[in-house]
Amino acid sequence: SLGVDWSTTAHGDLDLDDGEINHADLDEEFWTALPVLEHIRTAARSRRTAPTAVLGSVLARASALIPPSTCVPPFVGGTVPLSIIVALVATTGGSKSATDRVAADILTNTPPGVGGPFALGSGEGAAEAYLERYTAKDDNGKNVNRQRQIKYGVIFTLDEGRVLTELGSRSGSTIVPTLCTMWTGGDPGRMNASAETRRTLP
């Protein structure tokens, strides 16, 4: 389950009902190290959102723009793509969605081959987001369903952590295992017998 006890997402070890959540922000040396980091911090502050949270959202969106052929070297095991999962933690009304909107305004250009943001719904739907279905003719001239991958990167979002908990707890749900597989660069699809339900990603 991504190494997280999802049953605690509503409150967990954070006492959200008693006072403020204490968190350490990144220091001044970090934010002034690169112009792009200063830009992110300035944009976040101008919209009254947390710079560190906006940085996380920017990184999540940026990772979808990087082709999967760009990988982390095989320090342990094999190579893995630069996929990232970011969880913004705050009380209800804590500007989580606003934070992501700031990130969207920072990264405004979505190149061909990148989709989203799409709301997560199911593991099968996550794999389907990369594909296009079309009809072709086989050797006998009969119409057959085919698929092809048209996206190399997709941005997925989920406004509330408890929604992922509910989705993952449903009988037969594949959403959490699929996220883990996609995060590590595996194929989240299924080689089913029926062409209508077959999903494979190279």
Kindly give the residue locations of the regions a language model identified.
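Phosphate-handling catalytic cores of nucleic-acid transaction enzymes
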Residues: 2-202
